[in-house]
């Protein structure tokens, strides 16, 4: 049975499923630098689909609503059909990545409470940071919606951070995207090593897409993705 392709991004394809659901097919592509560097990492799509499904199920079990419904096949997720908001929301527990370049903050500083940032999804403009005023002016979301999203992000962190610590992993930061259904905000997109920074507790070993960003070979990246999924799912 063939399904109508609705859209295709760097790492996923979206297909129509029924009136209220879509299929998210995870591709084997891996990218960095707003798509400037691209490769095919065999098996990554399956790993990311399974990782996202596992973590969405974890969130759902704790009362956090996501778009996850179930799996269509090993690399394809059945999800609620959302009107997605073109904003990436990042929660940072420990400083790394762009924040240490943008601000006088040192690598490894611990944020208590966590820092939450909003970025416009726009590769050409390199995903500029947004504040409440920008988002209201651009009609992306109201201030009340932004505050609700911040509340959800903190709740997600309260679930994920201790869960990963129980696996001897540190959640440095993570990114989520949100959509609306009947004016309700719901977590959409994915929750994978493409959208989280994970370090091994103690050693500081990188177990996420930062390996690829820093030039590691594809086999090393794949082994990290495999190890991460094995550790969280055991």
Swiss-Prot record:
Q: Which UniProt keywords apply?
A: ATP-binding, Ligase, Nucleotide-binding, Purine biosynthesis
Q: Which cysteines are joined by disulfide bonds?
A: none
Gene Ontology molecular functions: ATP binding; phosphoribosylaminoimidazolesuccinocarboxamide synthase activity
UniProt entry tagged with the keyword Metal-binding = no
BP GO annotations: 'de novo' IMP biosynthetic process; cobalamin biosynthetic process
Involved pathway(s): Purine metabolism; IMP biosynthesis via de novo pathway; 5-amino-1-(5-phospho-D-ribosyl)imidazole-4-carboxamide from 5-amino-1-(5-phospho-D-ribosyl)imidazole-4-carboxylate: step 1/2
Does the UniProt entry include the keyword ATP-binding? yes
What the entry lists under CDD domains is as follows: SAICAR_synt_PurC
Q: Which InterPro entries match?
A: SAICAR_synt/ADE2_N, SAICAR_synt_PurC, SAICAR_synth, SAICAR_synthetase, SAICAR_synthetase_CS
Q: Which Pfam families match?
A: SAICAR_synt
Transmembrane residue ranges: none
Q: Which family does it belong to?
A: Belongs to the SAICAR synthetase family.
Q: Which HAMAP family match?
A: SAICAR_synth
**What is the protein name given in its UniProt record?**
Phosphoribosylaminoimidazole-succinocarboxamide synthase
State the organism of origin: Sulfurisphaera tokodaii (strain DSM 16993 / JCM 10545 / NBRC 100140 / 7)
State which gene encodes it.
purC
């Amino acid at each position: 049975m063939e399904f109508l392709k609705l859209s295709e991004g760097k790492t996923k394809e979206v297909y129509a499923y029924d009136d209220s659901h879509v299929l998210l097919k995870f591709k084997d592509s891996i990218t960095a630098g707003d798509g400037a560097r691209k490769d095919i990492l065999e098996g990554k799509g399956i790993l990311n689909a399974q990782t996202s499904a596992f973590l969405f199920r974890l969130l759902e079990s704790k009362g956090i609503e996501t778009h996850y419904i179930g799996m269509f096949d090993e690399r394809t997720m059945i999800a609620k059909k959302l009107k997605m908001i073109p904003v990436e929301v990042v929660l940072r527990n420990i400083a790394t990545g762009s924040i240490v370049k943008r601000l006088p903050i040192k690598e490894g500083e611990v944020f208590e409470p966590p820092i939450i940032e909003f970025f416009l999804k726009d590769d050409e403009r390199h995903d500029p940071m947004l504040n409440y005023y920008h988002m209201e002016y651009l009609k992306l979301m109201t201030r009340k919606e932004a505050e609700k999203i911040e509340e959800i992000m903190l709740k997600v962190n309260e679930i994920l951070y201790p869960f990963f610590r129980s696996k001897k992993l540190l959640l440095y930061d993570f990114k989520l995207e949100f959509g609306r259904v009947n004016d309700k905000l719901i977590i959409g997109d994915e929750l994978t090593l493409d959208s989280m920074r994970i370090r091994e507790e103690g050693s500081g070993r990188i177990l996420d897409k930062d390996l690829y960003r820093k030039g590691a070979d594809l086999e090393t990246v794949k082994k990290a993705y495999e190890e991460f999924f094995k550790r969280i799912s055991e």
